[in-house]
């Protein structure tokens, strides 16, 4: 399983985010990336299972929006095919369908997913974050608040040291 983390406001302490995010690296030791959305941070530790090439590395981006996801999207090939006239896919990753789905259907896209997942989407147009998980929480997604009251999402809860 991979690890995802999101900080949903302009971050003035990248080191603190990196320190917390580093505690989850055991879930994704193959590669790591943090992207600054301009309105917060999204982090991804990769355990390469699907989309094994570098193009399958997250966060995925599309038109100023970003997504990080830990999950398995069943039947993603069918979803890719339905979006292929509007979007050229860059990888074999099942999670790459999420942003084109979101751009096309908004949050209604989650009803279309046969999946076990936890994801965080940053919408570059509205400058909002959307966090979601599968209905029964096979892939849990925790949230909390920092000292400033900013919401933080993480796939794996780790207690402060």
Feature-to-residue mapping (PLM):
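Cysteine-centered catalytic environments shared across enzyme families
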Residues: 1-159
